[in-house]
């Protein structure tokens, strides 16, 4: 999806997808390990074919990378709500896409704990494995 590089955007795509590759991790319990460790050891990747469902995505510009990984970030939930996860790859089918620029977003960040200490490098390793830094 093309959009100006400095615009925050939210997207919902509902429809039937020819293929979609998603990843998920088992539920974790305290003390929480860094996500990059969990993904290396326990990530499960599923490829779904001809599946009905919804993608929800956010796109943040590089200037907002402290809030979310720059560029698009999508999650998927099947229509029957039995399968879902972080989208790694997909082939579209039929569907409807809704895209909206967002100027306001309210986020409550944890004051302490594992989420407050995630490094940009570990986030990039989880969200964009193998990606080269654009900085």
Can you annotate each of these PLM segments?
Residues 27-29, 72-73, 91-92:
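Short, solvent-exposed amphipathic alpha-helical segments in soluble enzyme
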Residues 78-120:
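A hydrophobic, small-residue-rich beta->alpha segment in the mid-to-C-terminal subdomain
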Residues 12-14, 23, 56-59, 75, ...:
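Residues in well-ordered beta-strands of folded domains
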Residues 69-77:
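Histidine-centered divalent-metal-coordination microenvironment in nucleic-acid enzymes
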């Amino acid at each position: 999806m093309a959009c100006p590089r400095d615009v925050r955007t939210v997207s919902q795509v509902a429809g039937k997808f020819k293929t979609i590759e998603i990843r998920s991790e088992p539920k974790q319990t305290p003390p929480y390990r860094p996500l990059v460790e969990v993904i290396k050891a326990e990530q499960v990747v599923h490829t779904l074919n001809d599946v009905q469902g919804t993608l929800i995505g956010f796109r943040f510009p590089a200037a907002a990378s402290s809030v979310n990984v720059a560029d698009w970030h999508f999650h998927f939930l099947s229509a029957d709500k039995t399968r879902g996860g972080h989208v790694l790859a997909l082939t579209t089918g039929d569907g409807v896409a809704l895209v909206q620029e967002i100027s306001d977003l309210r986020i409550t960040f944890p004051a302490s704990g594992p989420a407050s200490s995630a490094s940009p490098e570990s986030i990039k390793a989880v969200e964009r494995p193998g990606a080269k830094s654009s900085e």
